[in-house]
């Protein structure tokens, strides 16, 4: 059978055996315009009054709308204009509205990315602010402590807002169980200290810090407690189909609407593992998720429940922006072929640096497959650099990627191995029985 896999902006077409185990989401395509879907959602909210009624009771201050950054493939341009028009129709001026980008520790958005995400009109007419976790002057310390006993420091614009709206993509998440909802606030809008704790060794070493698991998941418990300390007044949860188009919205009370969205995602993009595969062929999600190797790690971790011990993974990502941050590149190079040393060092608190959590999650994959069986294909990173990233490196020019991967697949098929495939990468998650 011929299967289209997401890869960069264009994708790859690969031939697989008909008997391959296929992990794909089963969302039905929505025929309704995204803006109209969103309006229907906010007029028929889960667990709250409609947005218009809530806005009538708002406190004095700005209307802050929390949005995701470029690493999330939310097509804001398809519904945000309608949301802003709806808010303005309630008697609110444009200069009373702030779009706050929940970057966590990601870099600030570029102008080009803002135009891509929101459209030129919104960029020209609304104030857009990127959260900077390292800027202590832009943080406010709240009374009380988080679930872990940590201080809660949140973005000043969010805390001081007269009305808070959060938006987010709900999908499985390899640390928090599911994304969206409370995750827009923590780690999206918190301090550097909170992010370090949230992504620290102890949290991520817990077996329940994993895809589609919420119970006893320390990441979920922590960010839920932070979100409850300064909750949103309204939440808009977005579900994307396998083509990264909006499938539906669940809006309303922050926690009720998020739980409803999670139930929907579980039903449509979480597939129980019936038979373990000898080899997995997986996308890393395509653009924009696979822009960096750092983000591609999500695709590597996602497929673990579907593969046997010492199984083989063939993964691929466009990596048009390369490996990731400077800190991440340096870390990966320093601990190349020394991943156990890395775990010991962070466990003993010898250091904490940005993006170390991604290597900790990466090591989960290495422990199951070994580095030789963890193949990664890309045209965005040189062979020398890719070889330092604790994978079996395959770097080829763009016009040779598809052919090279197909040859590898053909060799696996010839060996008689049972194959599982993930055409969408981490947007469909295997769940252990």
Predicted regions and their residues:
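Histidine-anchored nucleotide/phosphate-binding helix
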Residues: 73-92, 297-307
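An N-terminal, well-structured beta->alpha segment
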Residues: 18-59
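An acidic, phosphate/nucleotide-engaging active-site surface
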Residues: 109-178
